[in-house]
A protein has these predicted regions:
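Internal active-site segments that recognize and position negatively charged phosphoryl groups
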Residues: 101-108
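N- or domain-start disorder-to-order transition segments that initiate the globular core
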Residues: 1-16
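Short, hydrophobic/glycine-enriched beta-strand segments
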Residues: 18-22
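Active-site mouth loops of central-metabolism enzymes
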Residues: 93-98
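Short alpha-helix boundary/capping motifs
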Residues: 2-3, 37, 101
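Short hydrophobic/aromatic-rich motifs at helix boundaries and adjacent loops
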Residues: 13-17, 78-81
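Glycine-rich nucleotide/cofactor/substrate-binding loop typically near the N-terminus or early
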Residues: 24, 29-31, 36-92
Length: 108
């Protein structure tokens, strides 16, 4: 399984700085657009204000992404074909190249 880390998350992990994993189904399935984008960006901003690097996690085209760019957050927030991916669906999501928001179980 390939995992893609954002530059910010990767740099923080290398430097030993704190990183906080955030699930993304609240963005993809839990809130209406555009409230979901606003919520996600605000949550990440609060993390940074506290000295923690946010690592929102989602699956894009079968690839696990740890730390999302704003465009990726907007994509899972708006795209009706975005799947809800729990730990149970991770293998299928990767094999079928799904894009999806991750539940807490898949995020962990």
């Amino acid at each position: 399984m390939k995992i893609r880390f954002s530059t910010e998350v990767e740099s923080s992990l290398i430097a030993g700085k704190p990183v906080l994993a955030l699930e993304s189904t609240i963005i993809s399935h839990g809130m209406p657009h555009p409230d979901n984008v606003e919520f996600a960006l605000k949550a990440e901003s609060i993390c940074r204000q506290q000295g923690v690097v946010p690592a929102t996690i989602a699956v894009f085209n079968g690839e696990c992404c740890v730390g999302l760019e704003k465009a990726q957050i907007e994509s899972i927030a708006k795209d009706a074909s975005t799947k809800k991916v729990s730990r149970r669906e991770l293998g299928i999501a990767i094999a079928k190249r799904w894009s999806g928001g991750t539940t807490v179980s898949a995020t962990m």
